[in-house]
């Protein structure tokens, strides 16, 4: 089922900072500048993240003067829902319009253990992975922290209708998260904070294609967030073909950074490995992958790829997927095959946005 909403006009000239970009201490600092007590920050966050109001007038325990100051300083309406697709398995894909007319995707996935959301960090992507729809059209801009936070808020509002909640999230949507590092970290801290969305750090996962300097930086952060690497190949030659970023950040150097992260944090790392028919899915690839990961505290997530019309890759046959998994297991690698969701909608990352861009150019 698909629901489509009319687009809003661009409103670039009147753009104010999003209130969802502010961490609690930043809100306290702003209140101090306004001559307001800092305990109001907790009240404001309660309205934003617990009651999830859509306008300042609903913040009834704040004075009209403070509500006016908030309205004059910060946008509270960040996203406009353009399209909402619901899969037969309960997966929901949202296409949101931003203030400047660009669109982004967010996906809600339902699991036995709860509801997970996949968020976007950029409008487009500059990494150029040859199998990904997100890179079509290149990178337009980074999202502000508040635009990432607002994705979770909007999806949670949709879940409020059925008294459900977002229990976990993955930063695996459109864009390279580490290419927007500061806004990513602001988002994670707001999302994790008890006064914010209060999603536990161990229920959040950040994925990167392998920007090595940011991996070292991420290892020093004081957040116990799960970490994943988009690997997709067991050697440099094949990875450079699939992921041009490997030409800048070589696989041996990436593995050194990963080992540093694991040793520094003590946390297990996840390797995402998309299976592309005839490209990286043979037994010899599995054997090479097992050798590459030997001694690394890790888990491999095998991903049967979604078909993207603009790309030439095909799905690996089911029996070959199981053989690849068995080859890894026989060599002591912790591995699972990712459950497919949203297969009957535009579920691959960037597909719905690419479809929307095509409509715009007609």
From Swiss-Prot:
Cellular component annotations (GO), alphabetically ordered: cytoplasm
Start and end residues of each Radical SAM core domain: 111-344
Keyword terms, alphabetized: 4Fe-4S, Cytoplasm, Disulfide bond, Iron, Iron-sulfur, Metal-binding, Methyltransferase, rRNA processing, S-adenosyl-L-methionine, Transferase, tRNA processing
Cofactor details (free text): Binds 1 [4Fe-4S] cluster. The cluster is coordinated with 3 cysteines and an exchangeable S-adenosyl-L-methionine.
Enzyme active site: 105 (proton acceptor), 349 (s-methylcysteine intermediate)
Location of this chain's protein in the cell: Cytoplasm
Chain's role: Specifically methylates position 2 of adenine 2503 in 23S rRNA and position 2 of adenine 37 in tRNAs.
Further details from the record: Reaction proceeds by a ping-pong mechanism involving intermediate methylation of a conserved cysteine residue.
Similarity annotation: Belongs to the radical SAM superfamily. RlmN family.
NCBIfam families hit by this protein: rRNA_mod_RlmN
Annotated protein name in UniProt: Probable dual-specificity RNA methyltransferase RlmN
Biological source species: Bacillus cereus (strain G9842)
């Amino acid at each position: 089922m698909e629901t489509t909403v009319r687009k809003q006009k661009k409103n670039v000239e009147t753009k104010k900072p999003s209130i969802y970009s502010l961490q609690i201490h930043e809100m306290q600092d702003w209140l101090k500048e306004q001559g307001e007590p800092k305990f109001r920050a907790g009240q404001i966050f309660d309205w934003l993240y617990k009651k999830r109001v859509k306008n300042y007038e609903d913040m009834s325990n704040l004075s009209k003067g403070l509500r006016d100051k908030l309205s004059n300083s910060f946008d509270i309406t960040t996203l406009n829902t353009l399209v909402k697709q619901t899969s037969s398995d309960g997966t929901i894909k949202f296409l949101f319009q931003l203030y400047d007319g660009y669109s982004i995707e967010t996906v809600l996935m339902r699991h036995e253990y709860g509801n997970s959301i996949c968020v976007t960090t950029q409008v487009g992507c500059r990494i150029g992975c040859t199998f990904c729809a997100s890179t079509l059209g290149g990178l337009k801009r980074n999202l502000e922290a508040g635009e990432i936070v607002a994705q979770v808020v909007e999806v949670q509002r949709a879940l409020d209708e059925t008294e459900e909640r977002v229990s976990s999230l993955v930063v695996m949507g459109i864009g390279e998260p580490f290419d927007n590092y500061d806004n990513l970290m602001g988002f994670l801290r707001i999302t994790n904070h008890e006064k914010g969305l209060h999603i536990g750090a161990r229920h959040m996962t950040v994925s990167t294609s392998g920007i090595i300097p940011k991996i070292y930086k991420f290892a020093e952060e004081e957040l116990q967030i799960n970490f994943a690497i988009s690997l997709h190949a067991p050697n440099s030659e094949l990875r450079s073909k699939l992921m041009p970023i490997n030409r800048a950040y070589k696989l041996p150097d990436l593995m050194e950074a990963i080992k540093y992260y694991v040793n520094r944090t003590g946390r297990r790392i996840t390797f995402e490995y998309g299976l592309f028919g005839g490209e990286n899915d043979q037994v010899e690839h599995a054997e090479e992958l097992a050798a590459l990961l030997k001694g690394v505290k890790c888990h491999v997530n095998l991903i049967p790829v979604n078909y993207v019309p603009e790309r030439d890759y095909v799905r690996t046959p089911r029996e070959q997927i199981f053989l690849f998994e068995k080859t890894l297991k026989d060599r002591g690698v912790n591995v699972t095959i990712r459950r497919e969701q949203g297969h009957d909608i535009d579920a691959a990352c960037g597909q719905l946005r690419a479809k929307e861009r095509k409509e715009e150019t007609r």
